[in-house]
Amino acid sequence: MAELHLRGWLVSGDGVAIQPVKGRSWGDVIAEEVAKFLNGTWSDYGLGGMCAVHPHCRLRIWYSDFDGTLEEVMEQFDMKLYGGKVESEYHQTGYSEYTSTGIDVDNFTIGGHDLEMELSSHIGEFCHFILETDIE
């Protein structure tokens, strides 16, 4: 399985999860990275748009209030889930997963779920966006 792992802060305004790109939303930047990963291409639909749909994907999104490695965020999530407290400092974490569904980069959806809306509900949080697919 091939994997795309994007990480960064979700911020409002011109900020993006990957890198600052003036005048573009972070949703557009993430969608473009996904299109590149899926070997998608830009198509001219008049206003422009990406043409990349892949039927077999697994998307995991981890959220936290700190800039940590995926392992650190997963550990904090487990502590939250099971009520254990290994460290004295606690961080808020969250997790979403979409499996066996197709991703549509043009509309930035997976299995009919609007990813920009999903990510928008986590503005101000750190995000690990992990897309796995069966492409070679």
Regions found by a protein language model. Give the residues of each.
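Short, extreme N-terminal segment that most often corresponds to the first beta-strand
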Residues: 1-19
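Acidic, low-complexity, intrinsically disordered interaction modules
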Residues: 39-79, 90-123
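Short intrinsically disordered terminal tails
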Residues: 1-4, 36, 47, 75, ...
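A short, exposed loop/beta-hairpin motif centered on an aromatic-Gly-Thr core
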Residues: 18-21, 106
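Alpha-helix boundary/N-cap detector
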Residues: 21-29, 64-68
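Beta-strand elements of well-folded, non-transmembrane domains
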Residues: 10-14, 63-67, 88-90, 107, ...
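Disulfide-bonded cysteine-rich modules in secreted/extracellular proteins
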Residues: 4-10, 79-96
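Short conserved beta-strand and strand-loop elements enriched in small hydrophobics
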Residues: 127-129
